Regions:
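N-terminal membrane-anchoring/stem segments of glycan-assembly enzymes
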Residues: 1-51, 199
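Membrane-embedded multi-pass helical conduit in multi-pass membrane proteins
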Residues: 37, 42, 49, 253, ...
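Short, acidic, metal-binding catalytic loop of nucleotide-sugar glycosyltransferases
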Residues: 73-84
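A conserved acidic beta->alpha catalytic loop
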Residues: 81, 91-100, 117, 144
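Catalytic donor/gating beta->alpha subdomain of glycosyltransferases that bind UDP-sugars
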Residues: 107, 158-191, 224, 228, ...
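Long helical/loop segments within the catalytic core of UDP-sugar-dependent glycosyltransferases
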Residues: 122-124, 130, 148-226, 358, ...
């Protein structure tokens, strides 16, 4: 049987598709497998001890009248010596009853720091640090609830003098079983696995902004458009110290239930991370920063290239689908993936549960957010202030409720 030789175009299309697929495979499967192996070969144990340093819990808030009272009650009930813990609410010029509610907790030792103008969360945190007195600074959000022993667990790693920052475990609660919530929970389970591996062998490259602690002497004043979740770990690394993961220090928070809220949040976070990567590009030098640079490049830079790899794979397989059988099937498979995303989008609007289809739906949503964030970064758009996400379904979860939802 005569086999028609492939043209240069089809050979290029196959090469592009295979390269894109291989890169995505490494990003999502190869990197976790590599980190898992390396973390068991080059393990760096953290020395922990039951210490009780003086801590300052700094709670960032903007128009949080619905949740701030519950957050403060939760914080006051934490199992930590009250004379060793101060609580400061950093209000970013709230216009609702947030400040009034916080003042009501004044007799219980809660301090309100109010910004005279709205400068954003990062600036509010910087200024709250200036009026704090703790040796350990613990940063939280108004919608995040801590388990009773969370502070005791998170500070014990500071017995190790090589540790400058500790990230707790954030558990997302999907109370409404929404498609976005299920996808977020699955994604976060994957991220926590990576955190465990990265921490075992060295240092994290990011923390959860609502649950991390840092030595006062290591805290860096960040620019208003920087995202502390990512930048703090880089700052700590540049000081020669580690950021480690403490999974026993648990906080819980409700997931977003609407795709538009999750999309908006992801665009903002990714855009700010891209800006931070550009500002801290010296940390991407593998000759100087070795494994930390490798983690940054793979876990962040390559991860955010996913939408471009998806586009390249789709175009390449579509271009040669008429000439190469296996590319035709690959093209159909990709169309099916995006079809599932459409089903998820429609299902969310119709309040239909889509079960396991939530994962591909969330994958496409986050990939689209990465693309939009890249374009915003390209055009120089910055985020300093933003509106907190409000959802009638979001209620403050208790740690007990969240326990069964940890993914």
């Amino acid at each position: 049987m005569f086999v028609q030789p492939q043209t240069t175009e089809t050979l290029i299309a196959q090469a592009v598709f295979i390269t894109a697929l291989a890169m995505m495979g490494f990003i999502y499967a190869g990197y976790p497998a590599l980190m898992f192996a390396l973390s068991h070969i080059f393990r760096r144990p953290v020395r922990r001890d039951d210490i009780t340093p003086r801590v300052s819990v700094i709670i960032a808030a903007y128009n949080e009248e619905r949740d701030i009272a519950a957050k403060l009650k939760n914080t006051l009930e934490l199992d930590y010596p009250r004379d060793r813990m101060e609580i400061i609410v950093a209000s970013d010029c709230s216009t609702d009853r947030t400040d009034e509610i916080v003042r009501g907790f004044g007799p219980k030792g809660v301090t309100l720091y109010r910004q005279p103008e709205r400068f954003g969360k990062t600036i509010a945190q910087n200024r709250a640090v200036n009026v704090s007195s703790g040796d350990i600074l613990i940063f939280s959000d108004a919608t995040t609830m801590y388990e009773p022993d969370a502070i005791r667990k998170i500070v014990r790693s500071f017995a190790d003098h090589e540790v400058g920052c500790v990230a707790g475990q954030l558990i997302y609660v999907d109370a409404s079983s929404s498609a976005v919530g299920k996808g977020c929970s699955s994604y976060w389970g994957y991220e926590k696995f990576l955190k465990s591996c990265e921490s075992r062998m060295g240092s994290l490259i990011g923390v959860s902004g609502c649950m991390y602690a840092v030595r006062r002497i290591c805290h860096a004043r960040l620019a208003g458009d920087m995202i502390d979740d990512f930048v703090i770990a880089t700052e700590i690394h540049l000081q020669g110290l580690r950021t480690v993961y403490e999974p026993e220090a648990v906080a819980v928070e409700d997931t977003n239930h609407r795709s538009k809220d999750e999309f908006r949040m992801r665009v903002r976070v990714i855009k700010q991370t891209l800006s931070a990567l550009r500002r801290y590009r010296q940390a991407l030098n593998p000759f100087e920063h070795k494994m930390f640079a490798f983690q940054m490049i793979t876990h962040k830079v390559l991860r955010y290239s996913i939408p471009f790899l998806l586009i390249a794979a789709l175009i390449a397989s579509g271009w040669a689908s008429g000439a190469v059988d296996w590319l035709r099937f690959a093209f159909i498979g990709q169309l099916a993936l995006y079809g599932v995303a459409v089903v998820g989008f429609v299902g969310e609007r119709l309040k239909i549960k889509i079960g396991p289809l939530a994962i591909p739906y969330y994958f496409v949503l986050v990939s689209a957010a990465s693309l939009v964030a890249f374009l915003k970064a390209l055009y120089g758009e910055t985020y300093i202030v933003w509106e907190p996400i409000r959802d009638a379904h979001n209620v403050n979860p208790s740690p007990e409720t969240a326990a069964s939802h940890d993914s």
